[in-house]
């Protein structure tokens, strides 16, 4: 099903930014139908990125040709999420994080290849995690209500 997710836009680099846990990302990477996931639409903006050497050895499934319509739809949704007046989108950045109970353990920003491999463009931001912070807040999932005028975008 569809999820609502925040999409930020870094105007200096002209990149939309999305967020995901490390575990969810690993699951999406290995899906045979991953072309339906919004990440593939995001990575379609990442032209000319190269996978890290260790990522090449994973032999991840590629995006099947029959999934291209989903990739195009996700790409359009991401572009619309940051509004059309931003101009040309230069790429997509995924912020991956790992948390345990109430502690944020790691955070990194990555640029992905079209087959969802981590590219050579990666930054570890874990050094910026400082205590105290409140990570134990309970948040109720939002209902998908199309009449809401919120700053979230529904991505497939």
Labelled PLM ranges:
Residues 14, 40, 65, 120-123:
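Alpha-helical structural elements
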Residues 7, 57-58, 154:
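Intrinsically disordered, low-complexity segments enriched in glycine/proline and serine/threonine
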Residues 38-41, 45-79:
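Extended, compositionally biased interaction tracts of eukaryotic scaffold proteins
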Residues 2-54:
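Aromatic- and glycine-enriched beta-alpha-beta binding-site module
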């Amino acid at each position: 099903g569809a999820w609502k997710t925040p999409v930020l836009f870094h105007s200096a680099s002209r990149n939309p930014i999305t967020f995901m846990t490390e575990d969810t990302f690993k699951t999406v990477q290995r899906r045979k139908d991953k072309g339906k996931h919004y990440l593939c639409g995001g990575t379609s903006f990442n032209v000319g990125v190269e996978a890290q050497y260790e990522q090449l050895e994973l032999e991840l499934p590629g995006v099947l040709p029959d999934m291209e319509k989903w990739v195009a739809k996700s790409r359009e949704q991401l572009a619309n999420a940051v509004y059309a007046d931003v101009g040309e989108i230069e790429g997509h950045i995924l912020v991956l994080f790992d948390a345990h109970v109430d502690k944020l353990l790691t955070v990194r920003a990555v640029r992905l290849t079209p087959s969802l491999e981590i590219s050579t463009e990666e930054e570890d931001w874990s050094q910026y995690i400082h205590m105290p912070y409140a990570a134990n807040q309970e948040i109720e999932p939002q209902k998908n209500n199309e009449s809401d005028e919120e700053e979230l975008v529904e991505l497939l």
